[in-house]
């Protein structure tokens, strides 16, 4: 009995090793793309255009596009939302009182940029693959789906922008902020020492 159990385990081991090795290679190349955000987003834009051309050329799979749009809207909301929602923060009264202007809270996203990009790219690839199976081509009147998605997008983004204004946060930053000392006091201080 022990011999037969060991044989089945050893049969799966080479397969598991190959799968694990393939996963490591995949993860290696995925990690190499991390610092190249512009190139990653250009690649995702290419996937998006290929998907749009596919749907446009076959005039179908609108329900897949609608589901993809809802999923991308969900990802966008996660990307624009802070990790800790100020409305849900519970203060138990044990903290020291501080003024809002004195306290610095960096904006930390609920969904980081890399995971946002990765999920979005996977969604485009999966949706593209689904267009090759006719079972997913459900006949629908696409203008109704488009109107419903636009209304959903506008209402959701209005709520998100109101939340940003209410809690005074901006989810976008371009580059690293550069801080410099007060130059006027440094110049005046240097001039007073020359006596």
Swiss-Prot record:
Keywords: Acetylation, Membrane, Transmembrane, Transmembrane helix. It is a multi-pass membrane protein. It is found in: Membrane. One of its GO terms (cellular component) is membrane. It comes from the Eukaryota. One of its GO terms (biological process) is retrograde vesicle-mediated transport, Golgi to endoplasmic reticulum. InterPro entries: Rer1. The modification N-acetylmethionine is found at residue 1. Belongs to the RER1 family. This is Protein RER1B. It comes from Arabidopsis thaliana (Mouse-ear cress).
